[in-house]
Amino acid sequence: MLSPRRTKFRKQQRGRMKGISTRGNNLVFGDFGLQALEPAWITSRQIEASRRAINRYVRRGGKIWIRIFPDKPVTMRPAETRMGSGKGAPEYWVAIVKPGRVIFEINGVSQEMAKAAFRIATFKLPIKTKFISSRV
């Protein structure tokens, strides 16, 4: 699963997801892509599950690029712990995804195959997505 090797700070504040994605919102590497339509935190497990689903469907046919990286730590307190005594330990990593952000790109496969692979991958993600193509 994806996670940063090292970070400047162990814990982060939650922040908020306002507006649309101004960066990473068009295709760069592949011919087809999966674009987010809603804001969400996508965990490294969800990214890995969708990557595996795409790989399983495409087999050795195409090349896949993951355009998001989980670089935000989410902390959790142990169950049944009293209030106070600081912030919990980092539990998992998430990628902040805003509407318009390209999540995956794929190359070397037909449009029908790419569409079907991304459809399977979408079921693993907590957001609505849309299929985009660089071909006109």
UniProtKB/Swiss-Prot annotation:
GO molecular function: rRNA binding; structural constituent of ribosome
SUPFAM superfamilies in the record: Ribosomal protein L16p/L10e (SSF54686)
Compartments, as annotated in UniProt: Plastid, Cyanelle
Keywords tagged on the record: Cyanelle, Plastid, Ribonucleoprotein, Ribosomal protein
GO cellular component terms given for this protein: cyanelle; ribonucleoprotein complex; ribosome
One example of a Gene Ontology biological process annotation: translation
Similarity comment: family membership: Belongs to the universal ribosomal protein uL16 family.
Quaternary structure, from the entry: Part of the 50S ribosomal subunit.
Name listed for the protein in its UniProt record: Large ribosomal subunit protein uL16c
Organism taxonomic ancestry: Eukaryota, Glaucocystophyceae, Cyanophoraceae, Cyanophora
